[in-house]
């Protein structure tokens, strides 16, 4: 029964891998073509491009770690290979989370309307704010890598003291649990910032819609429709982001109690976030949405 469920989850992971690479790759391709043709790219398109690149890397890392964990191959990886694999996972996960958070801050500063002097100051300097936040996150990345490297070194030393590299499968959680715990702790900051940003954005959009409904009774202008669509995308993103964060927590707890099935199930749900959210970003971006419709029309015409 357990092997059948793992086979089903593996098929789901592969499907998410293909969908995630196609959707994120599409966004990178369209923005790069636009960048080459126009010699410039808007701030939001730059964020979307680098976000898509980081998620492609993250999806590949998640797929590799899935098959390594599924076939118990992680314990046979050399010390250098282990560091490369985990460091690349940490870096891709870091930029995936923080670029998504920066995107939420960008939307907040661009769309939301508050009368606070501090908010207006940040709103007028949105590009500088985004750049400073991105540079500031490198401090978190550096600290994260240092802490992860300590866990790797301790685990490798423990393996050497046991004189057998694959001393036991029960020893693997002694390495993976502290790594997952560290990743969870460093994910708290971007998750909290994104949550606050989107709650403020939702509050601002609702307030704006209420004002427009009073001024335009029985009439819905294009701007109102755009705000409603933005609100739907924001809520969807918030739910996906929350589910991804919860999966990290549950996965860490399941490994602590060595529950393989729950751990694999959480990994499957976790991959759904970087794979599916790109579709929401494509639908929410006029340029990407138009390009996707053109591609879909050409594919349909060839059929």
From Swiss-Prot:
Glycans are attached at residue 166. GO terms for molecular function: bitter taste receptor activity; G protein-coupled receptor activity. GO terms for cellular component: plasma membrane. Most taste cells may be activated by a limited number of bitter compounds; individual taste cells can discriminate among bitter stimuli. Coiled coil: none annotated. It comes from the Eukaryota. Keywords: G-protein coupled receptor, Glycoprotein, Membrane, Receptor, Sensory transduction, Taste, Transducer, Transmembrane, Transmembrane helix. SUPFAM superfamilies: Family A G protein-coupled receptor-like. The gene is TAS2R13. Belongs to the G-protein coupled receptor T2R family. Residues 1-7, 77-85, 150-184, 254-261 are extracellular. Residues 29-55, 107-128, 206-232, 283-303 are cytoplasmic. This is Taste receptor type 2 member 13. The keyword Ribosomal protein does not apply. Receptor that may play a role in the perception of bitterness and is gustducin-linked. May play a role in sensing the chemical composition of the gastrointestinal content. The activity of this receptor may stimulate alpha gustducin, mediate PLC-beta-2 activation and lead to the gating of TRPM5. The lineage of its organism: Eukaryota, Metazoa, Chordata, Craniata, Vertebrata. Gene3D superfamilies: Rhodopsin 7-helix transmembrane proteins (1.20.1070.10). It holds the Pfam family TAS2R. The chain crosses the membrane at residues 8-28, 56-76, 86-106, 129-149, 185-205, 233-253, 262-282. It comes from Papio hamadryas (Hamadryas baboon). Disulfide bonds: none annotated. It is a multi-pass membrane protein. It is found in: Membrane.
